[in-house]
Amino acid sequence: RPRTDWAVGTTIYPAGSLLAATYHEFLAGTAELSVVFEPDEHTSLEDYAWTRDHLVLVTLVDVASRVEVVTPGSWERAPIAGIPPKTNTVLVDVDEYGDEMFLDSSGFDFPSRLLWGLAGGEVTEIKSAPAFFDASDIEVTQNFVTSADGTMIPYFVVGHHGSAGPSK
């Protein structure tokens, strides 16, 4: 994962990309690099880990987590089912000898939850921190504001469902 743009021949891989190659070909200088992830103005790579058969990617899309499973070779990406939108989700651990993974997911309207699943399948909550308030009437919306230089800045508004106010 280059921290600065990386030129290989005539190809430039942007900083923050995740590249894959065959180990022996890479050492010999003959590898063809595959782009597994390439950042854009809305998305950055937060974390990644290998299970036995898959690569698990955690990206931030407009500051909200997206967790995907990548199949080696084709490098096709598929979202992991069972993770709510507008959350912060991190990899806790993966099984390098199997396809088990553990994630920690939390949001503005629910406490930290430990999730378990198999890469490529749906995740299941196995433990949760206690809730310190009733969030059944809480609504979370994501909005954007344009900065002076034209950059779209994401932000969240958290409030009671249907409430009116300066932020709505």
Question: What positions do the PLM features span?
Answer:
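Short coil-to-beta strand junction motifs in C2/discoidin
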Residues: 11-15
